[in-house]
Amino acid sequence: MKLLSVRYLRDQAQQSFNRFPWVMIAAILAVSFANYCVEFASSSTNLFPFINGMLVAALGISLFFGIIIFAEKKKLSKKQKKVLEFIGLAILVGIYYTLPDGRSSQNTALPYYRFAIFCLCSHLLVSFMPYSKSKQTLDFWNYNKTLFIRTTIGLLFSLIIFVGIILALMAIHLLFEIEFEDEIFLQIFIFIIGIFNTWFFISGIPEDFKEIELENTFPRGLRIFSQFILLPLLTLYLLILYGYCIKIIINWNWPEGIVSYLIISVSSLGILALLLLYPYRNDKDEAWISTFSRFYYYLLLPLVLVLFLAIGIRISEYGITINRYLIVLLGIWLTFTCFYFILGFQNIKIIPSSLTLLLLLASFGPWGIFSVSENSQFNRLKSILSESNSLKDQKLRQEILWKTNRLPELEALENQNLNLSLDSTQKEEVKSIIRYLSEHHGLDKIDPWFSQDLHQIMLAIKNDPKGNRSIDQSRLYLETMGLDLSNKPYQKDYIIRAKLDRHSTQVSGYDYLSQFHLNQQDSITIYAGGKQFDLSFTKNRKGVRIQNGQDQVKLSIASLIEENQVLSASEEDTNISPNHLMIKSQDERYKLELHHIRYTRKQDKEVEINSLSGILLINQKERK
């Protein structure tokens, strides 16, 4: 066997780029935007343009790949191919402007929900569009087999390369004491998945489709995987779900909501297994495959009925959400698929094409996933507040008013006491709906209910470097409604870090050294010299209590902070010498060297410590 040369690999890479230029350009852009987001996630005031650019470019990888494959399969002219590529580019630009831009909500997860729908649609289109009019389903199967195998091998190679590079970096760190930022590992992973994996995938797609279509040997490993792994698992899951259905009938209990997700997962697993075994359906030695393929869809119908029953109960109680809408949509698709094959139709291309059509129809318009789910939860919230008389004439009857001249500090006007006429159940429902709307749609629709512009207040907090980053949109709106989760005023977090570069801890005079990290709810146990030492915060969270049996010592951390005048500093994140962050007990049995302090400054200027980390030194010798 002739070994691959560097020149051969270079030529293959160049050939792949020339064949799929827009695919690689999209991959390079997606990786560039993604690495920018990783690098500047904490410092950028608005990542939405870069997140949206990353997602749209990622969509372009599959979209342009599908366009080029479609053009090659249909033998379109260069001009027709350019027209399709221009249409694809226009679609991507249109999608970019439909993604959330940060105006209605600062939740950077929002664009990913729409991206997931479009991404699934584009991949499904790639799977069937080149063979949309072909009557040869085996050609369609062979084509998707090539895509599946190439994807699997590409991911495996990418994983091996990533692990190899990470091990190399770890070796450099251990042998040469060179430090690497944590972000570099994620950036390397993004580069490998985005650039190498994409390039490797497209380089293995034959230009001659006859080479794919005339393939009459099927991978033995794929058959073994489907027959001896997927099908036994599928049978087990079906037995579990049917056992649950029998339990429902015997106890006459309504099904739990989670069963909907299980049914969707099991149904999809079964359809995947049948697709992988499709070429063997007429094999005389494997007659059971044909029998199982026919009866599988009969077995699915009762489970689909349970799915609709379970999700219907959840919708009647809690309204429609994105997830519930998708479950209903997938339930409709499963019902259609079951009846299609039960009635004797055999074209497996209907599976991806029908799902793509449903997803595309549900991705836009007033009937779409996002509009219906937002309106459903908005109407639920409006109904709860109206019934409790908290909302009247589209205005909240009470709300906390904020001092705009104190922004980005969030400080309420004095002497405001809210008494919302909501019981505990209603309060929890309101909190849940506000969180959902904030995370998935934004809170624009409820802005008119308030007398103050909460959107501008939120922007003032987020865009100012001194703003409290822990305040998100849902928390601001709930606090304004008098429904703050903690029922405490907002407090700014301060951090003190020790400069540990080339620092060594002085241990003379002490017998034991132990590192520790202490949170508000924690108590830490340290064993030294056969004795037990318990560390915890004092009740007022101003210091640390060290207990050894009946012996107890308290060390004041608040006074240490005051002594170093850290509270007067304008910086929220302060770095000082570790020599200023040491404190001893009076009898010098204990010494704390603090490396990290997180605390809040209450309205009365008192310090309240949230977390500590550092080193505890213990001297067990008796002091005279």
What feature does the model see in each segment?
Residues N347-F370:
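Internal/C-terminal transmembrane anchor helices
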Residues M1-L76:
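N-terminal signal-anchor module of multipass membrane proteins
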Residues A71-E85, Y97-S226:
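Membrane-interface helix-loop-helix junctions at boundaries between adjacent transmembrane segments
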Residues S363-S386, S390:
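Hydrophobic alpha-helical transmembrane segments in integral membrane proteins
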Residues K392-K624:
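Extracytosolic and intramembrane catalytic regions of membrane-associated proteins
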Residues A26-T45, S62-E72, L84-N107, C121-P130, ...:
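Hydrophobic alpha-helical transmembrane segments and adjacent interfacial helices
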Residues Y36-L55, K75-K78, P100-A116, L174-I188, ...:
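Membrane-helix interface and helix-disruption motif detector
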Residues G164, T291-G344:
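Membrane-embedded alpha-helical segments of integral membrane proteins
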